[in-house]
Amino acid sequence: MLKTRSIGLNVAGVPLLNNISISCPKGSVTALMGPNGAGKTSLLRVISGEYKASQGTVDINGRGANDWARPEIAKFMAVLPQSSTLDFAFTAEEVVALSRTPHNTGLSRDLEIISSALSMVDASYLSDRSFVKLSGGEKQRVHLARVLAQIWEHCENQSSDGGILLLDEPSASFDLAHQIMLIEIVQKISTAGVTVIMVMHDLNLAAKCADQLVFMNSGECTAMGTVPELLTSEMIRKVYSVNAEVGLHPVDGTPLIII
């Protein structure tokens, strides 16, 4: 369970977030959505601890985020930012291995987890290749494997306390096949009890994998609810100033946005 209570954020005197309160139950998938500059990434950074809120609190499993020791939270929460710069000629396997630093599980177990995480993101064949020579989509998949490996114990088992995965536009550089892969991964780990919070722009992709949506604009939460409640023509027009038709997907019945 993750909750934000009346979060406000000011950076260099500029207000970025105002009175944001959301609740994300254990094992849920929440999509943060809205136009560019709405505050989605800023909220994710406050939740992760990268930014310190100017007001309000973040509670994780009933404890204030500041009450978690860094080694403890590193085993429980992983963050995939929009972009990650890495200029060292590590192999893909070595990049994923960085995420096991907080753990004390031994080399044999860590190598097993690294291999499983790379396999999950369809990147086993990249294991020995230089990370800096990979394509953008390949790099993103390796980084996805890295954050999965960081909280692998929570992804693998139905643990009592879950785990949290924060993803900032994770599908931005993925082709269609790997967008589908991402949906399947999110569904699998959330079933295991991991709470997933994602910044997303693709409404149809969000409809496939999210349990709840949080629409943001100008640093405020304008609406929070389930996919059927919020993915309506009226809401899309209100949030994005775009006229769209919303039907039902012929296979799974999820909302289907047609521009």
Model-derived segments and spans:
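ABC ATPase NBD coupling module
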Residues: G64-A78, F88
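Conserved ABC transporter NBD signature motif
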Residues: G56-G64
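The feature captures the beta-strand-to-loop junction immediately N-terminal to the Walker
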Residues: M33-P35
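Conserved ABC ATPase "signature" region
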Residues: R109-L126
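Conserved structural motif at the start of ABC-family nucleotide-binding domains
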Residues: L2, L17-N19
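Helix-to-loop junction immediately C-terminal to a conserved catalytic motif
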Residues: S48
